[in-house]
Design a protein with these regions (language model features):
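N-terminal small-residue-enriched
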Residues: 1-118
Length: 118
């Protein structure tokens, strides 16, 4: 966000997606690939809502960028390996299940889309 490398820069609390979109980054899911007790900067992992009902709620921010942006770290500081400094990275990011029926999802004018289920 700091270098305006994201389309979401400066859009906190703004509507950026459909009302039915809630996106979560959760580093606390037991046994999941991106889960750890702490990030690579020592911050505890949390379940973080990034987008709620289409509104941008939070960024994924490491400690250095949090300081530069005058925000708090979100526990997203991860290293690619010991050779690299921590940077903002996802843990387990997913779109939360919606409440609409299958029929309601496709009742509009959408010509293309992706439907996923467990």
């Amino acid at each position: 966000m700091r270098k305006i490398q994201s389309v979401f820069t400066g859009k906190l609390n703004e509507k950026i997606a459909s009302d039915c979109v809630t996106a979560i980054d959760d580093g606390t899911i037991p046994g999941a690939w991106g889960s750890e007790n702490i990030d690579d900067e020592g911050n505890p992992q949390v379940k973080r809502v990034l987008i709620k009902n289409g509104v941008l709620q939070s960024y994924m921010i490491d400690r250095l960028n949090a300081r530069r942006m005058h925000m708090e770290s979100t526990g997203s500081g991860r290293r690619q390996s010991y050779k690299f400094e921590p940077t903002s990275r996802m843990s387990n990011t997913y779109i939360a299940p919606g409440k609409d029926s299958f029929e309601d999802l496709f009742a509009g004018n959408s010509k293309k889309g992706l439907y996923a289920k467990k």
